[in-house]
């Protein structure tokens, strides 16, 4: 009877230890998964490249190029749903502000493309300024906290 109780205790401790080890290794794996770049990072890098192409097009008055690239900025890809939920959860009460910047960027890039299609240089410059301002405002409000939270960069 005494040995049976000791055996059950040893088995119970072994099972609990195994479960704890499994859970802690899963948590560690999740922490590493969070350190992987978000899809948002690739989206932002592509947006940056497209903005450089637009800047080049404007400087050369290549309105066809600007009109071609502006929709890539206006209708940029969205992060996968799970990532989007993580991002919105992180921004919390600023989610409306974050979405607002995205909408302003969308509208300004659409206006930029339309102005370029009309070959209206002053309207292109005005729309591009609005686009740059919406990008800058979002970056100033969210870039540093994102890097700290999602990439542990301080």
For the regions a language model picked out, list residue spans one by one:
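Bacterial N-terminal signal peptides that target proteins for export
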Residues: 2-15
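Alpha-helical transmembrane segments
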Residues: 17-21
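Sequence context surrounding c-type heme c attachment/ligation sites in exported
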Residues: 30-60, 64-154
């Amino acid at each position: 009877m005494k040995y049976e109780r000791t055996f059950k205790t040893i088995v119970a401790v072994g099972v609990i230890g195994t479960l704890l080890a499994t859970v802690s290794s899963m948590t560690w794996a999740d922490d590493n998964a969070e350190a992987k770049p978000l899809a948002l990072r690739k989206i932002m890098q592509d947006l940056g490249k497209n903005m450089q192409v637009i800047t080049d097009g404007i400087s050369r008055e290549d309105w066809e190029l600007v009109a071609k690239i502006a929709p890539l900025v206006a209708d940029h890809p969205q992060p996968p749903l799970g990532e989007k939920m993580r991002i919105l959860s992180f921004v919390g009460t600023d989610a409306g502000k974050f979405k607002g910047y995205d909408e302003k960027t969308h509208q300004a890039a659409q206006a930029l493309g339309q102005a370029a299609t009309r070959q209206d240089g002053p309207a292109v410059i005005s729309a591009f300024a609005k686009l740059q301002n919406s990008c800058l405002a979002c970056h100033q409000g969210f870039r540093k906290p994102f890097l700290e939270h999602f990439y542990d960069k301080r």
